Amino acid sequence: MQGKRCRSGAAQEALLILAMETNEPTPTTEAAESDATVAARRKPRKLVVALTALAILLCVLAAAFFAYASDSYHDLDAHHRNLVSTETLPVQQGDNYLAFGDPNAAVGLVFYPGAKVEYSAYAPLMRDLAERGYLAVVVQMPFNFAFFDINAADRVRADFPDVGAWWVGGHSLGGSMAAQYAVDHAGDGTLDGLVLLGSYSASDLSSTNLGAISLYGSNDQVLNRAKLEDNADLLPKGAETVEIEGGNHAGFGAYGPQSGDGEASITPAEQQSQTADAIDRYIRARYAEPSLAAAA
């Protein structure tokens, strides 16, 4: 029995030596290589599965976003009466904006719409400002979200080089994005102020010399009041806050009721007129100061 074991062991040793000399794989080597081959084949499969899952997830997210964005607030002026240009109040259609008023005005305002709001819905407010002597330009945003084109004001300002001084502003999300634009341009001497409607700044403007006016409706239930109060110290020194009694969030535009908003006790036209008056008073007071007189 012992002899058989010895012969068996010797045979295995001989086979191993022969395999090494002839470069033939042993059964153990073959198994290892087989496992490595299987593992190598599995890696691309796992990568394909992961990429496919990621692609599906991105498609679902994109579909959800487009469904959300398409449920937007449309301009109630179906016949575009507010876009009619007259000799006393010219209206110019740009590639992605509507400009109301004198293209050579002393002061211009570039306005960013609120989230999911059709930009032409702010035409009545822009006309009110134009009637007070401003060039008021409302910008069309990609998918109606201002965060997709924060620097839209650059193109508008380039199209109207004869305007004396520029302000930027916006409604709701548009106001917050306008504030970010103001931060980015506060130090280059090309921007004079910020207008916020139903909005607040998440960017620190406290150390700038910009003018700033913030307006909101007393019945606004969309605006985050806590954020409005907490972020007030981010505005420049001398910023003014105006509460429009009876106004709400949607009343700054002409797009109808907004989900979650309070009911206004004044008409949108009244709210827009009061808004234009307050902006006009504030801006004129800013330029009445000796240090700002040369800007307008």
What is each PLM-predicted segment?
Residues 126-146:
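Conserved alpha/beta-hydrolase
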Residues 170-178:
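Gly/Ala-rich beta-loop-alpha elbow adjacent to hydrolase catalytic centers
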